[in-house]
Amino acid sequence: VICPDLPLYGMTEYYGKVVYQDWVDCAAEIVMYYQAREIRPTFLFGLSAGGILAYQTASGLPEIQGVIATCLLDQREPLVRKNVVSSGWMAEHGLRLISKASAWLGFIKVPIKWVGNMKAIVNNEELAEVLMRDRRSSGAKVPVAFLHTLLNPHIHPEPERFSRCPVLLVHPENDRWTDASLSRIFYDRLNCSKDMKLLKGAGHFPIEKEGLMHLEHYCVEFLEECLAQRLVSNCQ
């Protein structure tokens, strides 16, 4: 299992300008690096915004057996944008300011919690406060240019033309940040083999015991089904 820190978050060091497409490129490079070292079936797992990132990464790579995501948030959709931001003011005015400022002031960093509703990242208020104080996590500062590109991603192919691999959406049932209906906007358009499961009792970051147990069960089941299908295809 490889769980990398992408630029702007975690312990990864970076230099120069960082935009959202860099995340897609980094994820693809990491996958190709490990695939070149060892031939194994490869699955991508995306948590929160990482769900659509996993989809984008899989879209550009030939040997991906499956994608698992807790959310599939298409930020191009106005309804999705409106619900992921921190406030009504941000939805009405802030996003427009970010778009206008990106060209000239894209290098300026702002706390991600000013833009995203980080208070709802988990359903435990104490843990949410800890995460928002962590400058390598929900308390991170990110460039305006990154925010602009995150909110205006280039998604190719569109889900109606995606047939690269099966997709499993394991959406938290009690997500107070991004309701499952927001992920369904993108999920329902997918033209590949797909399945959706709800993680009972789980918040946006599924830390609850019941939700984690369901997450493990659904993921293992999905992996086994995909690998069995791969074996059948190889024998034909």
Regions found by a protein language model. Give the residues of each.
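Conserved alpha/beta-hydrolase
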Residues: 1-13
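Acidic catalytic loop of the alpha/beta-hydrolase fold
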Residues: 138, 174-178
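Catalytic active-site module of serine/aspartate enzymes centered on a nucleophile-bearing elbow/loop
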Residues: 193-236
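Conserved acidic catalytic loop of the alpha/beta-hydrolase fold
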Residues: 24-41
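Short beta-strand/loop motif that positions the catalytic acidic residue
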Residues: 163, 169-171, 175
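Active-site nucleophile elbow and catalytic-triad environment of alpha/beta-hydrolase enzymes
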Residues: 141-159
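Short alpha-helix in the alpha/beta-hydrolase fold that links the catalytic acid
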Residues: 165, 179-188
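Alpha/beta-hydrolase-fold enzymes
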Residues: 49, 53-139
